């Protein structure tokens, strides 16, 4: 993967901590952040024209190969948050999306990243998936002005 940082647009994904997102102590259960980051990544791609329907129709996929999260401050039921996502780095066939989860009052709750591979199914979903070079046109959709 290239070590050159990418100057990315930033997408926002709103979310709210629900009762089922909390552990017995009444604070957010850590897997919720990973669920939100995954949803934010898919929403980010959809915002530039690559929604799940198009990805399936064109046999593209972006499997997750790594994810991490630092938990900075506990969220509680009812907290309204936003996930701010950007492309941190593009490699030849992989990319890194960085995420920051911020409560509506500006408190940073968590930050994390996902490494994904750009791939294409040989004959559609369910067939063999092969890594593909990320098209320059796709990268351009995420480039900040």
Predicted regions and their residues:
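Catalytic strand-loop segment that frames the active site of acyl-thioester-processing enzymes
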Residues: 2-47
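Hydrophobic residues in beta-strands and at strand termini
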Residues: 15-19, 71, 118
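Residues that recognize and position ribonucleotide moieties
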Residues: 11, 26-27, 60-62, 107
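HotDog/MaoC-like acyl-thioester-processing domains
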Residues: 2-7, 13, 76-80, 87-145
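Hydrophobic beta-strand-centered segment that forms part of the acyl-chain substrate-binding groove
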Residues: 44-95, 109-111
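Alpha-helix initiation/capping motif
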Residues: 22, 26, 60, 127-131, ...
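Short loop/turn motifs enriched for small/polar and acidic residues
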Residues: 20, 65, 100-102
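Hydrophobic aliphatic residue packing
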Residues: 17, 27-28, 64-65, 83, ...
């Amino acid at each position: 993967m290239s070590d050159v940082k990418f100057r990315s647009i930033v997408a926002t994904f709103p979310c709210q901590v629900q009762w089922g997102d909390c552990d017995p102590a009444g604070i957010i259960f850590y897997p919720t952040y990973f669920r939100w980051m995954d949803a934010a990544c898919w929403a980010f791609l959809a915002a530039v024209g690559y929604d799940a329907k198009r990805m399936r129709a064109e046999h593209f996929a972006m499997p997750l190969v790594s994810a991490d999260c630092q938990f900075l401050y506990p969220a509680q039921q009812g907290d309204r948050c936003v996930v701010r996502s950007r492309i941190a780095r593009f490699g030849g066939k992989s990319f890194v999306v960085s995420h920051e989860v911020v409560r509506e009052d500006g408190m940073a709750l968590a930050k994390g990243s996902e490494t994904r591979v750009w791939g294409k199914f040989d004959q559609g979903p369910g067939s063999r998936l092969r890594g593909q070079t990320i098209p320059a046109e796709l990268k351009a959709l995420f480039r900040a002005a």
